[in-house]
From Swiss-Prot:
Induction: Only expressed during growth in minimal medium, strongly induced when cells enter stationary phase with highest levels reached about 2 hours after transition to stationary phase. Expression activated by ComK. One of its GO terms (molecular function) is single-stranded DNA binding. Its main location: cytoplasm. It holds the Pfam family SSB. SUPFAM superfamilies: Nucleic acid-binding proteins. The lineage of its organism: Bacteria, Bacillati, Bacillota, Bacilli, Bacillales. It comes from Bacillus subtilis (strain 168). Gene3D superfamilies: Nucleic acid-binding proteins. Keywords: Competence, Cytoplasm, DNA recombination, DNA-binding, Phosphoprotein. Phosphorylated by YwqD, which increases ssDNA affinity; dephosphorylated by YwqE. InterPro entries: NA-bd_OB-fold, Primosome_PriB/ssb, ssDNA-bd. Transmembrane segments: none annotated. This is Single-stranded DNA-binding protein B. Disruption phenotype: Transformation efficiency drops 10- to 50-fold. Destabilization of DprA.
Length: 113
């Protein structure tokens, strides 16, 4: 079996970096990926793909990328489920990223507060 995904798109918001109780960095990002064709109105639509990044990949992406950054993500599709507060099973499909390539001409560091 083969499960590999390669995407190029722009971050829809700043990476959401957190740490697990074991100290592992994890970040969640959403990529806006343009479709390769135009709709009936002549506009290019985008798909919004949720991605999860771990460890150094998560930390580096949070450090060097922000909303609007152009990135390339390679990884695999993963599905999982959990029970929400109302007791309803929620199913999630996301990309578990192996690598993230920063594709802007120059990485943009976040401004110090």
């Amino acid at each position: 079996m083969f499960n590999q995904v390669m995407l190029v798109g722009r971050l829809t918001k700043d990476p959401d970096l957190r740490y697990t109780s074991a100290g592992a960095a994890v970040a969640h990002v959403t990529l806006a990926v343009n479709r390769s064709f135009k709709n009936a109105s002549g506009e290019i639509e985008a798909d919004y793909v949720n991605c999860t990044l771990w460890r150094k990949t998560a930390e580096n992406t949070a450090l060097y990328c922000q909303k609007g950054s152009l990135v390339g993500v390679s990884g695999r599709i993963q599905t999982r489920s959990y029970e929400n507060e109302e007791g309803v099973n929620v199913y999630v499909t996301e990309v578990l990223a192996d690598t993230v390539r920063f594709m802007d001409p120059k990485p943009r560091e976040k401004a110090a507060d």
